[in-house]
Each structure stands twice: as C-alpha cells, then as structure tokens.
Amino acid sequence: MIEADRLIAASGRDREEVQDRAIRPLSLDEYIGQPVVREQMALFIQAARGRGESLDHTLIFGPPGLGKTTLANIIAHEMGVSVKSTSGPILERPGDLAAMLTNLEPHDVLFIDEIHRLSPVVEEVLYPAMEDFQLDIMIGEGPAARSIKLDLPPFTLVGATTRAGMLTNPLRDRFGIVQRLEFYNDKDLSTIVSRSANILGLAIEDQGAYEIARRARGTPRIANRLLRRVRDYAEVRGKGQITKAVADMALNLLDVDERGFDHSDRRLLLTMIEKFDGGPVGVDNLAAAISEERHTIEDVLEPYLIQQGYIMRTPRGRVVTRHAYLHFGLNIPGRLGEGGDFSGPGDE
C-alpha cells in the first residue's frame, strides 16, 4: 500500500515507535501545542488527584500522528500510576480483555489504541467494567455455563481513535472526558523539532527547524521523521549542522516540497488538472487514471489535500481549487474566478 512507503505518511512504523519513545514528552509541562487540551487535562488530573480518585475515562481522537499515545502516557505519569497498553484488534476475545483488567492496580491507566476496532463481544464486556468496575464473565459452556462477577480496582480507560464516528453510542457515552487533537501550527511544530533535535544531540538552527516544521503537514510524527532524514543529509553533506539551506536541500532531495506534498500528492493534483480539466471527476475514474485503489485516494491522499483547500468534494465529483493551480504556477481557469471554486462543497 502506498501509505507504508511514504516519507510523509502519518501512520507509525514499528522501528519508529521505538525511536520516538526517547523523544516523547513525559509531562504536561513538556507537552507542546494543543493548549486547550493541555489546560483541560491539567485541571481534570489535579482535581482527580486531590480527591484521591482515578481520572474519568478519557477518549482522545484526531488524525494519526498527533500524539494520542503520548498524551495517554502523560496522563498516567501525571496521575502517578502505571499504564497498560493494547489495541482494539489485539483484544479478540473477552478473555483477552479480562486478563488485562484483572492485572490493573488501583487508579492505573488502561490504554486501548484503535478502540473503534473492538469486536462487539469484547465491547459488551467493557461496559460494566467502565461503569461499575465489575467484570462479568462466563465460565464453562452449554448447560454448565455460568456467569460470575469479579470486582475490579478503579481504573482509567484511555481510548484513542482516528475515527470517532465509528464508535458505538453506548461506548462513546461512557467516556467522561473527550478530547480532540488538532493539526499543529508551524510555530509549535518548529518547537517540537528543536526539542527533538536537542534530545538527539543535533546541532540545528531555528530557521532549519522551521523549514522542517512547515513541510510536516501539521503532524509531529512526520516532523520527527523528516528531522531524522535531514540529520542523515546534514551528517554527510552539511558538516553535521541543520541550517535552513541544509534542510531545504535535504527535503527537496527527499521530494517533499514547501507545502509538504510528495510525488503522490502532486501526481493526483496534476492528473485532475491535466486529464480532467480540474474536475469534477469521480473517484473511480481518478483511481484508474493514477493506478491506485479507491480507498488509497479516500483514506491516504485526499484528507490532507482537502484539509488544506486544494481539493473539494462536490455532488458531481472531485474538483481542484484555485490553490492547486497557483501551487504549480499554472493559469487559473476563468470558471474559478477570484473567489476560488465551484458552487459549494458536498460529499460524493
């Protein structure tokens, strides 16, 4: 799949997860960006600790790479408790969840990534655990089967998802705290890059950090990945120091332009402009034209381009906006005018 091969993919990689642990912030004071989330969580945590209670169950959602796992670990650290981590697809049977719940200490954090992928049978077991701190499990099979209740210590469930809309209402309603993570601005990302470089022992100028940040698509995970690749370039061709010029040359070599677009992004936009006159074009026709799967366009390529205002979905199909023409230095068609685009957005 194209996502796994992209330098600017927001999804994580196994080796990357290990490397990122060394540069993750451990406290809210070290946490950069997301000011509203940070202030709210500091308040909730302080209140819970003051009462000697576990924090309310917390749902964190937003695009991949924005720090949901990092925030879950910070919550545990600030509460002074341990965190046990798992993910929705791993919890295949009720027994898998029961094993984790029964190993929790009072006020511990249970972190479930991709919580929207929990199976219905596991989710049913989770309801009484969240609400009453009790575990209802079946022992035996057939006529000899019986239900037993196990008391659980008070704990905090922290669920993370990129697709909050896929959560069932009963599960969503059991979270007392719901936090949405937004894309980062260039200033905050630049601070993150500088902090990561300092931890890794890299010499970096402020302008070099900003150059990396502005091409990172508003995502800390991408910013840290680009930093590691720019580090390689700087060590071989830049005397070990990351300046604006070194960062610019490195990222151009890596085919990441000033808007954070790579070859796949540009190919999609140029195909729409050159082969379909800017659209409207159906997603199946577009997929055939660039030899990609439909879901790759919808789940991997489109979201950032739509969020940045380069593509619109209309009732008639996808269209590029005037920003796409300006990005490539092309003349803007008269039908787009000064205001920009077609009559209005829609969902195809």
Curated annotation (Swiss-Prot):
Residue ranges of the region described as Head domain (RuvB-H): 258-348
GO molecular function: ATP binding; ATP hydrolysis activity; four-way junction DNA binding; four-way junction helicase activity
Localization terms from the record: Cytoplasm
Binding site for ATP: 23-24, 65, 68-70, 131-133, 174, 184, 221
Transmembrane annotation, as ranges: none
Keyword presence, DNA-binding: yes
EC number per UniProt: 3.6.4.-
Domain of life: Bacteria
Binding site for Mg(2+): 69
Gene Ontology biological process terms from the UniProt entry: DNA recombination; DNA repair
UniProt-annotated binding residues for DNA: 294, 313, 318
EC class of the enzyme, as a word: hydrolase
Keywords: ATP-binding, Cytoplasm, DNA damage, DNA recombination, DNA repair, DNA-binding, Hydrolase, Nucleotide-binding
Region (Large ATPase domain (RuvB-L)): 4-184
SMART domains: AAA
UniProt-annotated stretches for the region Small ATPAse domain (RuvB-S): 185-255
Any single Gene Ontology cellular-component annotation: cytoplasm
Reactions performed catalytically: ATP + H2O = ADP + phosphate + H(+)
Similarity remark: Belongs to the RuvB family.
Job of this protein: The RuvA-RuvB-RuvC complex processes Holliday junction (HJ) DNA during genetic recombination and DNA repair, while the RuvA-RuvB complex plays an important role in the rescue of blocked DNA replication forks via replication fork reversal (RFR). RuvA specifically binds to HJ cruciform DNA, conferring on it an open structure. The RuvB hexamer acts as an ATP-dependent pump, pulling dsDNA into and through the RuvAB complex. RuvB forms 2 homohexamers on either side of HJ DNA bound by 1 or 2 RuvA tetramers; 4 subunits per hexamer contact DNA at a time.
Quaternary structure and partners: Homohexamer. Forms an RuvA(8)-RuvB(12)-Holliday junction (HJ) complex. HJ DNA is sandwiched between 2 RuvA tetramers; dsDNA enters through RuvA and exits via RuvB. An RuvB hexamer assembles on each DNA strand where it exits the tetramer. Each RuvB hexamer is contacted by two RuvA subunits (via domain III) on 2 adjacent RuvB subunits; this complex drives branch migration. In the full resolvosome a probable DNA-RuvA(4)-RuvB(12)-RuvC(2) complex forms which resolves the HJ.
Domain notes: Has 3 domains, the large (RuvB-L) and small ATPase (RuvB-S) domains and the C-terminal head (RuvB-H) domain. The head domain binds DNA, while the ATPase domains jointly bind ATP, ADP or are empty depending on the state of the subunit in the translocation cycle. During a single DNA translocation step the structure of each domain remains the same, but their relative positions change.
Name of the protein: Holliday junction branch migration complex subunit RuvB
Originating organism: Pseudomonas putida (strain ATCC 700007 / DSM 6899 / JCM 31910 / BCRC 17059 / LMG 24140 / F1)
